[in-house]
From Swiss-Prot:
One of its GO terms (molecular function) is signaling receptor binding. It holds the Pfam family FARP. Primary role is to release GH from the pituitary. May act as an endogenous ligand in the bullfrog hypothalamo-hypophysial system. GO terms for cellular component: extracellular region. InterPro entries: FMRFamid-related_peptide-like, FMRFamide-related/fGRP. Observed in the suprachiasmatic nucleus and in several telencephalic and diencephalic regions. It is found in: Secreted. Belongs to the FARP (FMRFamide related peptide) family. This is Growth hormone-releasing peptides. The modification Phenylalanine amide is found at F107, F136, F156, F176. The keyword S-adenosyl-L-methionine does not apply. GO terms for biological process: hormone secretion; negative regulation of gonadotropin secretion; neuropeptide signaling pathway. Residues 1-25 form the signal peptide.
């Protein structure tokens, strides 16, 4: 009897706990569902019962504030567009022309008539051009060419164009087949006689003398 009573009490306790757990679980789920439904319904009701005055007072594209801001921005843009670019263009043009005249004449750059017209002191610049180094195919026309080439060393096959600078060739180094002056050549030949060792050297000496005499006559012409 005591055992039966003990088993019954245990069963009743277990059933009671299960029932309480199920009831709590069902209550919590139902509460969550009702809460979500209430929120959705509240939003729907707010949309339905929204006042018409709020809709009319909303900002639109024709409001006074928007028109005021738009007019100010358009006026600012027009004001900046009306500014003239003439001073800046003149500055850039002068900046592009003046350094071209101050730089050495290189890479085949020539003095153009446009630069002469745009720069008032172009004559002074043209006079200073012969003092610049002759590099990369720079060429000078007319008198400046003759005057500047007489002061330059004779290198890389530079030819003797006129008799204007023949006298200055004595001071230049003897390079690339340049021949000395006739008086100097005669003096060197008389003051430094060659010592002959064999007839072949004698013939070579005579050939060299004949060549120098021929070149000397060409220079004097």
């Amino acid at each position: 009897m005591h055992l039966k009573i003990g088993t019954l009490t245990i069963r009743t306790i277990m059933l009671f706990t299960l029932c309480t757990f199920l009831t709590l679980f069902a209550f919590s789920t139902c509460f969550d569902e009702t809460k979500t439904i209430n929120l959705e319904s509240q939003e729907i009701y707010d949309d339905l019962f929204e006042s018409k005055e709020d809709l009319q007072n909303e900002r639109n594209g024709n409001s006074d504030e928007y028109r005021y801001m738009g007019s100010n921005s358009i006026n600012d843009i027009n004001r900046y567009n009306r500014l003239s670019m003439q001073p800046e263009n003149e500055f850039l043009q002068e900046r592009s022309l003046k350094p071209a005249a101050n730089l050495p004449l290189r890479f085949g750059r020539t003095s153009d008539d446009k630069i002469a017209k745009s720069i008032p002191s172009f004559d002074k610049i043209a006079k200073s051009i012969p003092n610049l180094p002759q590099r990369f195919g720079r060429y000078l026309s007319g008198k400046t060419k003759v005057q500047s080439m007489a002061n330059l060393p004779q290198r890389f096959g530079r030819a003797q164009y006129t008799n204007h600078f023949v006298h200055s060739l004595d001071t230049l180094p003897l390079r690339f087949g340049r021949t000395p002056h006739s008086d100097r050549l005669q003096y060197e030949m008389n003051s430094h006689p060659l010592e002959l060792k064999n007839p072949e050297e004698d013939s070579d000496r005579k050939k060299r003398q004949a060549m120098t005499f021929r070149i000397r006559t060409d220079l004097q012409m």
